[in-house]
Amino acid sequence: GYNIPKSQHNIFFQGREYSPGILAFKEYKSVDKAVWEQSYFSNGSNGFVVTEHKRILESHASKNERAKFEKEMRMCKVCADNGYRINFLHGENRPKGQTYDITINGLKADLKCVSGGAGNIVKYAKKALVKQGGEAVVFELPSRSPEFYESLTKARRECGGRIFFYIEDEMILKELKV
């Protein structure tokens, strides 16, 4: 590779076509470091996670907040490994109706980890898409059980918005198309 001083990057790359990887990496590196932490970059897929410093501070409030942060960060990394650009947002002191967890490629979204059965999926989707101001919801599902797919389809029909999901063991993010 080239050993180009950072101050010369724009001059060197000017007029050259950027690969998607270079564009993603430039976006990842260009965030305001006073506001965002560069948390994760997936070299294989060019996805990334940047986290608001306020969100990291919130995770120190309690053991439960730390566990919630770690679960949500794990979900963000799965999205990044599937090629998505994730902004992981702080949760406290946000306007009512604007309490989604992340943006995924600029789309306001909430993260929902389903640990039991499929019974709460529609309720989770409604909360994310209506009460929390999301345009999408990302579900982590524990298995490929048909009941989960049926509930996701019902949620998509009833709630609108976009629904992404992945199976915990597979970690391949898919969007539900209805």
Q: What are these model-predicted stretches?
A:
Residues 4-90, 114-178:
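Metal-dependent nuclease catalytic core centered on acidic motifs
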Residues 102, 107-115:
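Conserved catalytic cores of phosphodiester-cleaving nucleases, focusing on short active-site segments
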Residues 95-98:
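Short acidic/glycine-enriched loop/turn segments that link adjacent beta-strands
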